[in-house]
Amino acid sequence: MGGARTALYNWILALQSNGIFVLRIEDTDESRNEPQWTQGIIDALAWIGIDGSDPHFEGPYFQSAYAAAHVAAAESLFASGHAYYCDLTSEQIQERAKAAGKPGYDGYSRDRGLTAGPGRALRFRVPPGTTVVNDEVRGRVEFDNATIEDFALLRGNGTPVFILANVVDDITMNITHVVRAEEHLPNTPKQQMLWDALGHTAPVWAHVPVLVNEQRKKLSKRRDKVALEQYRDEGVTPEAMVNYLMTLGWAPTGDTEIVDFATIAKDFRLSSVNHSSAFFDIKKLSAFNGEYLRKMTLEQFVSACEPWLTSDKALWPAERFDRGIFLRIAPHIQTRVALLSEVPAMVDFLFVADLAIDAAAFEKAFAAEWARPLLRAMREQFTTADWNHEALKAVVETIGAANDVKLGKLQAPLRVAATGRSVGPPLFESLEILGRDESLRRIDAALLRAG
């Protein structure tokens, strides 16, 4: 989720400035490099509107393709005196730190004059003084260079470390703005030193707040539901997801948070992003999604629901789905659902071959002594009544008034008989759509079951 929001920040910045959003896959860690993961990133970006075919989009580029440039940059830093080689092993570094009572690398090889060789890492010579990072979100942030150890650029086997590769790629690709999560802020002074040492002006930095869960802990892949596809598969629309993500740490102008992307893209400013961590509230996301579903035209809503009603997400074979029937019930459920995944269970009684009855609901609905005889009375009058929801409701109201049973109670056995459950779309509209023959058949089956 945090990555998706940060991607949106970058995308909007590119749109506002007529710039380029660059997708770079940092694939130098082979243990975390799988082709399907790259495609998953591309698909997730496309779902939230960051389209690879848009002229403001470039990539994906793969960091591993630029390894030679990374090594060349490291060698130039050595040649200019900004870096030096060190032959200490990690164990030796730890032993020296323990003996000195100070954590980290102590700069032991700074003035030893070592050259490249097997097992020798190249380290950056951190200058004295302070490094100032001017951040679009956090303002001026100062770092005492004395707290930053001489960090590695090349490992002992000659491969580049990520922090060097990242800066070299940014320079090569003419990156002007780096917008990322605040957890990367501690690395920023190191990267800014590298930009300076390589003779280039650092980009505009912007470190945005992290997203947290209900316990106010940073969202975690291990603990929290954080993948976009999980929400997509539950029936969150991309428009609602984008709108909600953009309200986490930033607020649109006006008195409502429900705003379209065009408005967001026009009004968003990095300088207006909040410093505090933002709570990713799943319930609020669902509420946003419900608002977006209600804003759809009927045809848009039906089209959005169809994948859920004609695939294995449905509770019936695809061939039993009838778009015309769903078009009739859709206005009655559009205002009642927050997620598209809720739709199949609300309309299954219209499409299943064998209606499943909620046993607990059935027992409760038929517990009253009047339930069976009054349902029989309804069934008798339904055989000749006009088959529309007004006439059907009038029949039930008349029977209820004659027997001193309120409409709400009298609907219970009828609803369970017709739909199999105690809740659902408006009952009389549902009966009208279900049809006389099927409704009477289900009432007969319920009466037989009730005994």
Feature map (PLM): residue ranges:
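Catalytic adenosine-cofactor/nucleotide-binding cores of aminoacyl-tRNA synthetases and other
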Residues: 31, 198-357, 419-451
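N-terminal Rossmann-like or analogous alpha/beta NTP/dinucleotide-binding catalytic cores
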Residues: 1-101, 186-200
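Short, conserved loop/turn and helix-capping segments at secondary-structure boundaries
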Residues: 4, 35, 181-188, 222-225, ...
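C-terminal accessory/binding modules appended to enzymatic or scaffolding proteins
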Residues: 362-422
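Glycine- and acidic
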Residues: 22-27, 173-178, 397, 424-429
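Active-site cores that bind ATP or allylic diphosphates and position pyrophosphate for catalysis
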Residues: 76-79, 84-207, 212-219, 227, ...
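Short histidine-centered catalytic/ligand-binding loop motif
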Residues: 177-181, 230, 377, 381
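Residue-level signal for inorganic ion chemistry
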Residues: 10, 41, 77, 81, ...
